[in-house]
């Protein structure tokens, strides 16, 4: 009877090992089977709702607002986002925090309006801060009208041997080449153009992170023949000096920034750009923005970048199958070892008796 039981355990061990190896081999063989995959919009919303239920406490919100009010100049995009979290959760701010918030808004909005800064913002949003744009209700528009000029300036600079504005050039090329680049980015040409325009405006407002600037520069140097720029007179000429495959990371980045802009609008998207360091950040942030809409800002202020972006991902079903296989393997092996140990102990005791 014990022999039959051990045979059964051994068979279970073999089956568990086989299933585990097959699942692992399938994940390794299929490039589309990844251990971590993107959550759906509903899953992102549910995951962040659970996190906010734990983290967005009255003390946490008051502490975050106090810290933001201590910064100079005030970041009113972030301040209003955290204030909206309190409203969403039906929380009343402590009187000192509410008083400080109202006083800061009164001071900043009055000063900016009286100083004439709003006129500048309305004329060109790129010359003012995001807080000024919010207070002045200035329209933040994205236009590819400067793309041709950006490429022309770079061509003249290269011919003259002077410094090229590589960021402006890279984003101008993406904006003008959007139709060709949608093949490698998977987005629409309009989305690519909007994303490139958003990044250009962010650069003008000094909102791009150093790592993102480095990524854009690397893509330009790998994907564009700078020596041929002075000969570019049309989009057809531009296609001859651009390597679409090498510009794929920049096209993907622009697509995701365009998605974020579609979900949130330019002002809120520009605020989130400070958290984006590479293409992966942009993709996950765009996923969050499409799922959460305007609530994205409040969640990133309370949860932080890392936790918000992690909430957009989950383990794939294949990984759960692999874990289940491992668990079965360990359980079977443990049972087999226990059975063998029991048999050995029984035989030993009988001999000693």
Predicted regions and their residues:
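Alpha-helical protein-protein interaction scaffolds
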Residues: 34-103
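Short, mixed-charge, low-aromatic patches
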Residues: 18-21, 35-39, 105-111, 177
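Compositionally biased, low-complexity segments of secreted and virulence-associated proteins
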Residues: 2-5, 103, 112-162, 170-174, ...
